[in-house]
Amino acid sequence: MHRTTRIKITELNPHLMCVLCGGYFIDATTIIECLHSFCKTCIVRYLETSKYCPICDVQVHKTRPLLNIRSDKTLQDIVYKLVPGLFKNEMKRRRDFYAAHPSADAANGSNEDRGEVADEEKRIITDDEIISLSIEFFDQSRLDRKVNKEKPKEEVNDKRYLRCPAAMTVMHLRKFLRSKMDIPNTFQIDVMYEEEPLKDYYTLMDIAYIYTWRRNGPLPLKYRVRPTCKRMKMSHQRDGLTNAGELESDSGSDKANSPAGGVPSTSSCLPSPSTPVQSPHPQFPHISSTMNGTSNSPSANHQSSFASRPRKSSLNGSSATSSG
């Protein structure tokens, strides 16, 4: 399966940094003529003495260059989300500035201009932040009842709550569930958001950004347990071998009944179809005992064992029947 390429923040720096001050964008502002971006204070100060873009020398405006620059909120949000701690440090600098200069006119500015916006309001998540999440079993039957608007049955609340670092990956969460619930390696655990399985390399911060978590409650996650693909392939091979064994035993009995078949047929060493098949997952009540459309319970027609069936053999050309 193709894995998404993850790159370092230093590889994106040319797209996130202002060429005038050498730092990350603060109040990113873009020239509409050439779409080059700078910090607001940097480009305003530069255009006081020049009417051309500092990067490509395109004329911004003949007389009033400030008319052709626009605030770029989308770019600024990207910078805040990609650079750890930048938003928090900038808000602190603004609060400190207005505390040291109470006469500065900040009444006309927004809360963000005054540094009075918290990370939660801006939906900025840092790697070291602790995220509250809920995890519960993904019940397909419950989902079907909800879709069909059936009356829900009395259900046990199996939802659990965790507090984890934002940098924790889905793979770590799967390992935690396997260890906590003693799930054997023959079963696969999928962590899901609503009905969509999540990739192992997703962090909780990635999930919060991708699915626009609003912090109005714990991050809702689900999990399901299912047999691994390898186990399912082995079951298919076992079924094929059993069918081949039945064909072989039938052909052997035909040879015993024929006049030319002087050698008694030998019983197959493959397991008998009448042998009861144990449920592969008795410890997981959530998992159905039916796999690939076939039930694991033995058929009623195969209750009698091969040992109790009469055996036919040929002795001196005469057919004899002996019971086991």
UniProtKB/Swiss-Prot annotation:
Where in or outside the cell?
Answer: Nucleus; Cytoplasm
- A Pfam family reported for this protein in Swiss-Prot or TrEMBL: RAWUL
| Induction per the UniProt record | Down-regulated by oxidative stress.
Domain of life from the UniProt record: Eukaryota
- Biased composition annotated in UniProt, kind: Polar residues: 277-307
The subunit structure is:
Component of a PRC1-like complex. Identified in a PRC1-like HPRC-H complex with CBX2, CBX4, CBX8, PHC1, PHC2, PHC3, RING1 and RNF2. Interacts with RNF2/RING2. Interacts with RING1. Part of a complex that contains RNF2, UB2D3 and BMI1, where RNF2 and BMI1 form a tight heterodimer, and UB2D3 interacts only with RNF2. The complex composed of RNF2, UB2D3 and BMI1 binds nucleosomes, and has activity only with nucleosomal histone H2A. Interacts with CBX7 and CBX8. Interacts with SPOP. Part of a complex consisting of BMI1, CUL3 and SPOP. Interacts with E4F1. Interacts with PHC2.
Role played = Component of a Polycomb group (PcG) multiprotein PRC1-like complex, a complex class required to maintain the transcriptionally repressive state of many genes, including Hox genes, throughout development. PcG PRC1 complex acts via chromatin remodeling and modification of histones; it mediates monoubiquitination of histone H2A 'Lys-119', rendering chromatin heritably changed in its expressibility. The complex composed of RNF2, UB2D3 and BMI1 binds nucleosomes, and has activity only with nucleosomal histone H2A.
Q: What is this protein called?
A: Polycomb complex protein BMI-1
Give the source species. Mus musculus
The gene from which this protein is expressed is Bmi1
